[in-house]
UniProtKB/Swiss-Prot annotation:
Binding-site residues for S-adenosyl-L-methionine, renumbered to this chain: F47, H80, A81, S82, R86, A111, D134, D160, L161, L176, Q185
Protein name, as recorded: 16S rRNA (guanine(1405)-N(7))-methyltransferase
Gene3D superfamilies: DNA helicase RuvA subunit, C-terminal domain (1.10.8.10), Vaccinia Virus protein VP39 (3.40.50.150)
Residue ranges with Basic and acidic residues bias: 284-293
Organism: Micromonospora olivasterospora
Role according to the record: Specifically methylates the N(7) position of guanine 1405 in 16S rRNA. Confers resistance to aminoglycosides.
Listed InterPro entries: rRNA_MeTrfase (IPR025981), rRNA_MeTrfase_GmN_bac (IPR010769), SAM-dependent_MTases_sf (IPR029063)
Other comment: Protects M.olivasterospora, which is an antibiotic-producing bacterium, against self-intoxication.
Keywords, sorted A to Z: Antibiotic resistance, Methyltransferase, rRNA processing, S-adenosyl-L-methionine, Transferase
Amino acid sequence: MLAAAKYRNLDPAFVERLAQEAAERFRDRGQAVKYAKRKLHQAFGAFVAGTPAQAVAACVAKIAAGAEPKEAGREAMRAHASSAERVDWLEPFYERVAQWCGPASSVIDLACGLNPLAVPWMALAPGATYACYDVDRTMAEALRALGTVYPVRVNAAAVDLVAAVPAAGVDVALVLKTLTTVEQQRGGRRVAEYRRELTAVQHHSDGARSLSGRRGYADDPDAIVQRAVHGTGYEVVDEAAFGTEALYHLVPLAGTAGRPAPAEGAAEPGATRPVVDVPATARPDADRVDPTG
């Protein structure tokens, strides 16, 4: 699978996990390969609309040459299908996140795609740290250069989030359009584990449509959020909608982790506050095997 041009730059551990899972599930090699390709498409192929790494490099070069960061970032984000869906409401989207979170000194962006290009819209404290992770090694390498043109310290790496979630001891964690993919990869139980590993979930954003725009998911946004949050010690206290996305504000339940409950509508001091976003009410393109293999 790594021999295919589309997938050769993916995190080897991610591909090896899928190959091992396919081999354990199917004795027939053809069926195993088909299964693994479907999982690759669900987690990566369905979201690529161009050449993300090249788009990031071009964005950095334009900003360094004097281009307006928001204009350059918005253009580059169109090289990633999932990130591209958010370009029309970036400003109100992150204004609401800022209202809920306040200025953040540290951010972790899981399954980031090209969302780090949205830094100019985010409420970040001076010198903030922005750590971003995806399965594409070349894209992660390109994203590191954002630290040369954005007023943040950028760390980027290729990580298989289903196998291990990076430590989230930060102010805000962004997990955009990822919960459904995690469910497809490992099932609902793994989603609960995924949420617990994030330590403190404060926001959740769901896509109202798939990449194709078709409706028909068995679950709606509320169902996915409630299932993901169940047993984590957090509750939904507010929500908002932008275009095809729904945001959910979560805070710790009273007395969890030995701490008192925060004031109504406020985040608990010192807690990580992720924004999580997944397609929730439409059957995604990711359900199909990638015909290009």
